[in-house]
Every structure is written in structure tokens, then in C-alpha cells.
């Protein structure tokens, strides 16, 4: 769900629970001050119970630091293993299979129904 139009921010008051926004590529950062009137905080990434919460999937070189990367952005939920340049300079190093550590929670893919962390960990 995008936060690009501040005219709908008031609807956030209708939601129960803590509201923390992880900004994405469609969110307008110049509206952050206004958004903070309706949510607890705004972040680019959150480390929660060893899980990395982001808008877009994190780089495969970073996934080993987390239990899961819970993200959206990939609306078709199609990630693939890739070769990458490790941050230590090794060329063409094949990453260990890690797709099971990426969980896409795009609103459309999860039928607009929230999932608990336990549900995501057990999928």
C-alpha cells in the first residue's frame, strides 16, 4: 500500500495496533512530517526479531544476517537466485540458495489480510 497521497493519511487512524511505515519507491519522502501525525514512525528498514523488513528485497549478500527478509515491491513474487560480486571482491561467487529466506507480503499477494511473523516463519 502506498503512502504517496497524503489526502488519505487520516484513514490510518482507523487501523488498530502500532503503525510503522517502511517507505518504498512510490512513497513521497517530502510528506514524512505529515505522515508522522498518523503513525508511530517511518523507516527505510526495520530489524525485528532477526527479520529484515524492507520495501524491496535486500541484496543476497546481506540475507545471511537475517532469519527472513519480509518485503513487498516484487508484485509477482518471482525472485531468482543470482550470481553476484561479494563485498569481499570474489568474482562470480554463487550464493547459497536463499529464496526460502525472502517472504513477499505485497498486499495483493496476501489477499489484503495481515500475516503474523510466526505464520511467515512457518511457511
Question: What spans do the regions from the language model cover?
Answer:
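Active-site neighborhood of phospho(di)ester-bond hydrolases with catalytic His/Asp-centered motifs
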Residues: 1, 19-25, 53-54, 68-73, ...
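Core catalytic region of metal-dependent phosphoesterases/phosphodiesterases
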Residues: 1-47
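Histidine (H) residue identity feature
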Residues: 8, 26-31, 55, 59, ...
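Short, flexible, glycine/charge-rich loop motifs used to bind or transfer phosphoryl groups or to couple energy/partner
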Residues: 9-12, 43-44, 55-62, 92
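Short, conserved active-site loop motifs that form the nucleotide-linked donor/cofactor pocket
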Residues: 19, 36-40, 51, 67, ...
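Binuclear metal-dependent phosphoesterase catalytic core
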Residues: 47-49, 59-68, 74-123
Amino acid at each position: 500500500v502506498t503512502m504517496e497521497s497524503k489526502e488519505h493519511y487520516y484513514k490510518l487512524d482507523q487501523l488498530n495496533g502500532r503503525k510503522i511505515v517502511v517507505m518504498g519507491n512510490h512513497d513521497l519522502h517530502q510528506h514524512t512530517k505529515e505522515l508522522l501525525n498518523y503513525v508511530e514512525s517511518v523507516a527505510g528498514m526495520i530489524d525485528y526479531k532477526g527479520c529484515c523488513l524492507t520495501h524491496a528485497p535486500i541484496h543476497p549478500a546481506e540475507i545471511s544476517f537475517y532469519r527472513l527478509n519480509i518485503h513487498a515491491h516484487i508484485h509477482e513474487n518471482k525472485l531468482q537466485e543470482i550470481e553476484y560480486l561479494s563485498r569481499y571482491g570474489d568474482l562470480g561467487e554463487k550464493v547459497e540458495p536463499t529464496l526460502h529466506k525472502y517472504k513477499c507480503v505485497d498486499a495483493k499477494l496476501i489477499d489484503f489480510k495481515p500475516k503474523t511473523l510466526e505464520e511467515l516463519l512457518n511457511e
